Each structure stands twice: as structure tokens, then as C-alpha cells.
Amino acid sequence: MRGKAFAVQNAKQKAKTTKPRRKEELIHMKFTVEKRLLNEAVTNLQRAVSTKTSIPALEGILIRSEENRLILTAYDLEIGMQTELPAIISAPGAIILTAKLFAEIVRRSPDEDITIDVDDRNTATITSGVSCFTIIGMDSAEFPELPKITDADTIKMPQELLKSMIR
């Protein structure tokens, strides 16, 4: 009992002496994206997410925001997928979010734009309408780089065309 009381008192004392930071100082990344587009992308990317791995970053989706787009990547060391979405970027950056949890949050969010704020401790706040979720992410540096295809011819095609060809 005494140990708990001391810990609580010590925590209160630290809280009093720690200078609170302003919210804008904590923002590491911030963007807004259409829910429908994000939901489709995350659902597709889950196919390349590893479910049983000793590398925690592979259980997540790497989210990078730059210019006017999001780049989402999933990779299980055998299959890698990457997709881009248009987005409103307030602060560029990158984070890894656990794919299963992130997909569930996006799926259950209201049909409104989704805003994601990430602070300097990789805490992501996901807001849509009146819904607000906070999850802990991982540093983007932990995500392995996708292999580069160098000596091959490449083509670009619309996603829907590729899907229809595979079916």
C-alpha cells in the first residue's frame, strides 16, 4: 500500500514540475483523407500484411504523407504492396500503424473525411465526425524497404483494370 501511495505522490509531483507542451509542438504528421478511399486501400493492403512474424513492423501498414498524397505500404517479406491516395497534408511525416486495428477503425468510422494526427511519440489520433480513436504506432524507420526492381520493364495501369484482369 505504501509503495502505491508513494508512486502516486511521485507521479503527481512530476506532473506539477513538468512543463506542458503546446499541442502544435507535438505534431509530427497530420493529414485528412476521404474515408472511402482510405478504407479501400487499407482493405487491399491487408493481403500483404504478415500475421505471424518476429518483426512487429510487418504486422503494420507504413503510412507516409508528402505533398498532396498518402503512400501506404504493406510487406510480408514475400509480397509487397504500395498504393497512393490524394490527401490534404498539413504536416508531412510517416508512421507504422497495426494493420488489423487500423483497418477496423477506418471501417467503423462515419462516412466522413478522416483526419490523422501523429505526435512525436508515434501516438496517432484518428478523427472522423464525432468519432475519435487514439492508437500507438511504430517508428517508420522500423519498416523494411521494399526491394527495387531494376532490370525489368514496368508498366502503369489503373487499379480497376488490373483487378478485372486477375479475376
Task: Label every PLM stretch briefly.
Residues G3-R167:
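Structural preference for solvent-exposed beta-strand-turn elements
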